[in-house]
From Swiss-Prot:
It comes from Streptococcus suis (strain 98HAH33). GO terms for molecular function: RNA binding; tRNA pseudouridine(38-40) synthase activity. The active site is at D53 (nucleophile). It comes from the Bacteria. This is tRNA pseudouridine synthase A. Belongs to the tRNA pseudouridine synthase TruA family. SUPFAM superfamilies: Pseudouridine synthase. Pfam families: PseudoU_synth_1 (PF01416). Disulfide bonds: none annotated. HAMAP family: TruA.
Amino acid sequence: MTRYKAIISYDGHDFSGFQRQPHARTVQEEIEKTLVRLNSGQPVTVHGAGRTDAGVHAYGQVIHFDLAGSRDVEKLRFALDTQTSEDIDVVSVEQVADDFHCRYAKHSKTYEFLVDIGRPKNPMMRHYATFYPYDLDLSLIEEAIQDLVGTHDFTGFTASGTSVEDKVRTITVASMEYDQQRQFLIFTFSGNGFLYKQVRNMVGTLLKIGNGRMPVGQIKRILAEKDRGLAGPTAAGNGLYLKEIIYED
């Protein structure tokens, strides 16, 4: 068997997430269906580096899978890209070592989150940016977001009931940019890993700080007390994008 690594992008609107689940359309299942056709009807299991939720998009999701024999990687990429549904794009395919695992190999991830703060909102972007209808002081967000950078226990920013025991993660980039032309906020977070719904919970908290309903020092308190109840609401998944995954050599 030969192992292949692929970078894919997808529009998450019509998917119930990346991971295969019964009675639901998922990214994993769509790609596996194509690979079965390319593998003479034999089953193929696709592994993903990130398990994006329903409605979440990706520019740079990484997957791996095994096929019998060696294939021309560009022909394989073309076949996967053209025979998989139009809301999935196969950006690249390469052959990798048999022990490579896209999820467990050491890597960093970058997420983007788009917030529509236009008045009126842009209805064409309703599936691709989260609309925020309330006033915001962007200087408060810019001040508070810096408290997320560094190595912290992010228990207060993960979904309750998560089975992950070690909730310490390192965030290397936490920034917000205002796109004045589109009237969008673009949040960017890079780090060595993110907990379940962590990015969406951080954005929900930052928006509440920007609206003046939480103090600017609230993030420091959440990190110190590890209390999800101190954080803001979970932002909707439609604004979230898995932008890039970089593996260490």
